[in-house]
């Protein structure tokens, strides 16, 4: 049966179905020059094991296998490396409860005391509560 292998270029292989994935990798290594240990053979997006035969993997006639190069990993570039970094480093501080604001009669009493009772007499023109002096 015919099998298509897409690596850097598209290749057509004649196989019986009893070949292992490792044998396909060796064949691709001779065609493309990619070492077999650096190859990942994919069938419909899922990687295939080296020991499995093509028949066990469900490879049929005119199926396309994709060969991807194994990438070195371990380093993430850009904003993904910093995602959640600040929030994770910041220590959790318990919220402080605010004092309840007075309402009604008690609020009016505070206003009266502030405006008329606790007033210190000053010289000059009387200034408003928001004046910058």
Curated annotation (Swiss-Prot):
The modification N6-succinyllysine is found at residue 125. SMART domains: UBQ. It comes from the Eukaryota. The keyword Ribosomal protein applies. Keywords: Cytoplasm, Nucleus, Ribonucleoprotein, Ribosomal protein. GO terms for cellular component: cytoplasm; cytosolic small ribosomal subunit; extracellular space; nucleus. Residues 84-110 are annotated as: Disordered. Transmembrane segments: none annotated. The keyword Ribosomal protein applies. FUBI is cleaved from ribosomal protein S30 by the deubiquitinase USP36 before the assembly of ribosomal protein S30 into pre-40S ribosomal particles. FUBI removal from ribosomal protein S30 is a crucial event for the final maturation of pre-40S particles. Gene3D superfamilies: Phosphatidylinositol 3-kinase Catalytic Subunit, Chain A, domain 1 (3.10.20.90). Residues 97-110 have a biased composition (Basic residues). One of its GO terms (biological process) is defense response to Gram-positive bacterium. GO terms for molecular function: structural constituent of ribosome. In the N-terminal section; belongs to the ubiquitin family. In the C-terminal section; belongs to the eukaryotic ribosomal protein eS30 family. FAU encodes a fusion protein consisting of the ubiquitin-like protein FUBI at the N terminus and ribosomal protein S30 at the C terminus. PANTHER family: 40S RIBOSOMAL PROTEIN S30/UBIQUITIN-LIKE PROTEIN FUBI (PTHR12650), RIBOSOMAL PROTEIN S30, ISOFORM A (PTHR12650:SF15). This is Ubiquitin-like FUBI-ribosomal protein eS30 fusion protein. It comes from Mus musculus. The gene is Fau.
């Amino acid at each position: 049966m015919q099998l298509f292998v897409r690596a850097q270029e598209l290749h057509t292989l004649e196989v019986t179905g009893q070949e292992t994935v490792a044998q396909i990798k060796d064949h691709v290594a001779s065609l493309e020059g990619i070492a077999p240990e650096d190859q990942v053979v994919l069938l419909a997006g899922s990687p295939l094991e080296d020991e499995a035969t093509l028949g066990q993997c469900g490879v049929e006639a005119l199926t396309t296998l994709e060969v991807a190069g194994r990438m070195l990993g371990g380093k993430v570039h850009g904003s993904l490396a910093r995602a959640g970094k600040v929030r994770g480093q910041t220590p959790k501080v318990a919220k402080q409860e605010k004092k309840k604001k007075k309402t009604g009669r008690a609020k009016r009493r505070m206003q009266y005391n502030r405006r008329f009772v606790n007033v210190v007499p000053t010289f000059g023109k009387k200034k408003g509560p928001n004046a910058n002096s």
